[in-house]
Amino acid sequence: MDCKIDIIPQVLHFKQPAGTSRGTYTTRKVWYLHFTAPEFPNWVGIGECAPLPNLSCDDLPDYEEVLAKICRQVENQGGKLDMEALCKYPSILFGLETAIRHFFEGSWALWDTPFSRGEAGIPINGLIWMGDFNRMLAQIEKKMEAGFRCIKLKIGAINFKEELALLQHIRSHYSSKEIELRVDANGAFSPTDAMEKLKRLSELDLHSIEQPIRAAQWEEM
């Protein structure tokens, strides 16, 4: 099938600075893919490629050039994806898969579920971005007032003792049955102190501790 993939870059602006252990985001660049085919002139499939700077494994300095090259290859292959070759570019694979599936479905309603019909929501965690103690506490209180019962905190940017105190503050007011706590260090801990920090965190009855050390540190894990 003849097909065409247009790449549309956009810069999204965060409503407030989003802090992680790798820095603070104020903007995020994304690339939207528009998949079309002359055979079906009224159809369009839209996908999104959105790697996170310094976090995604395919955050490349020449990302846009790589994306353009892959899109041309997919066009030449009639819209077929080489899944094995694209595994090392997960954000590109996601964008292409989404666009192609949307195109052939002919609708945003990819699945017939209460959520896709707008009849019910999906419970998710309330994400707390990194900041100083008071700012993070204010975010937590706001999420809880909004009805969230699962709170996920980004940790690793401020003093560990302050982050621990923040978690202890929550636990002193809410048990694990009332509030489920999750933390994400984004690889901020070093292999030398990770075990001690994990031990201290485990005392707070956390649901999970995501990526304590950096990716690909296989021996240390």
Question: What residues fall within each predicted segment?
Answer:
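N-terminal capping/lid subdomain adjacent to the active-site entrance of alpha/beta enzymes
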Residues: 1-181, 186-188, 195, 199-203
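Shared catalytic-loop signature of beta/alpha-barrel
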Residues: 69-70, 205, 216-221
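Active-site loop segments of alpha/beta catalytic cores
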Residues: 190-198, 212-221
